[in-house]
């Protein structure tokens, strides 16, 4: 919320609305939904107890239960939920622990 400091899990990656979002790694889509804060989101379970969350999407392409491969387009960038502009909010989890995605992804 504006004026309130909170720990921010994950990273925000600015991109034009409608930009395709590729899956981080092979996995299975475990949830597709919408919340007031995340807007439209999708979560994917990966081998080894890892999972990823992609939020503020304008459109979700993959469906719950689908098997996806690294790089598959699973959604599109948007600004749904609490967002000040179009971007991808990306989280990486190991079990219930939040990991800093910056150590695991290349933004190049």
Q: Where do the protein language model's features map onto the residues?
A:
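Catalytic cores of peptidoglycan-degrading enzymes
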Residues: 1-108
